[in-house]
Amino acid sequence: MSGSGAPDRVDDEVLAEQLAYYRARVDEYDEWFTRTGRYDRGEAATAAWRAETDTVRGWLRALDLCGRDVLELAPGTGLWTTQLLDAGAAVTAVDAAPEMLDALRARVLGPRLALVEADLFTWRPPRQFDAVVACFFMSHVPDERFGAFCELLSASLHDGGTVFLVDSLRTENSTAADHVLPQASGQTMVRRLGDGRTFRVVKRFRGDDELVSACASAGITASVRRTATYFQVAVGRLDGRAARPV
C-alpha cells in the first residue's frame, strides 16, 4: 500500500496474494454484500446500500438478457449469477478460485450454468457471447493489465454484444471497518480476514472518463452512471452504440 501518493507497481506476486485472499475468504465473502460483521456500518448506511443495490440490479435487469448467452467474470459465490439465471440467461461463469466456484455450485445449479476455473489474467474465451458481466472485479485489475482486461471484454463479445460492469466507488463505508483504502493514486491495499490474516490486494478506483476511454480503446462504446454513494456502473456495446442504464 503506497503512502507517498505514487502509484503502486503490481506484479505477479501481488496477484497471487490477491487470489490467495479470495480463496481464504470464501466463508466470509457474502458478509460484504449483506453488510454484516465488520462491514456493518449502521442501519442508515445499510439501508442506503440496499437501496443502491436495488438500483444497480434494476439497471442490469433493463438489459433484458432472457435467452442470451452471457459470460460472467469473477462471479464469486454467485450473488449476481442468480439474477442472470433468473432473467433467463445461459451463464458461463469463470473464476480463478475453486472455493468460490464450490460456493456458487452450492447456491445454484442448472442446465443453463457452466462453471470454469481459470485465471482471468491469462484466460481466453472459447467463443463469443451476447453479453459480458463483471461485478466488482475491475477494481481488482491493476493498471498494468487493464488494457488487456478491456481487450478480453471485446474478444468475448459478438458484434453488438453488451458489457455490464459494476464496481465500488471510493468510500470508506464500503469496506470493512478495519480496512484502510489506498491513496487516491494508489492501487493496492491490505485486506484482513476475520482470523487476523492479512493479504495485499489490488484496489484501483477509476474515474468515469478513464473507464470510458479504456473501453473505447478496445472498441467498446460505454457510458457510466453512479449511485449516490456506493456504486459505479458502465454499460456499453461492442459495435459502438452506447447503452445507458435506465
Model-derived regions, located:
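C-terminal alpha-helical "lid/dimerization" subdomain adjacent to the S-adenosyl-L-methionine
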Residues: 166-214
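Class I SAM-dependent methyltransferase SAM/SAH-binding core
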Residues: 69-122
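Conserved class I S-adenosyl-L-methionine
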Residues: 2-64
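Short catalytic micro-motifs in class I SAM-dependent methyltransferases
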Residues: 136-140
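A short glycine-rich, Lys/Arg-flanked "PGG" loop and its adjoining helix->strand segment in the class I
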Residues: 147-159
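A conserved beta-strand element that flanks and buttresses the S-adenosyl-L-methionine
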Residues: 133
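Conserved Class I S-adenosyl-L-methionine
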Residues: 201-238
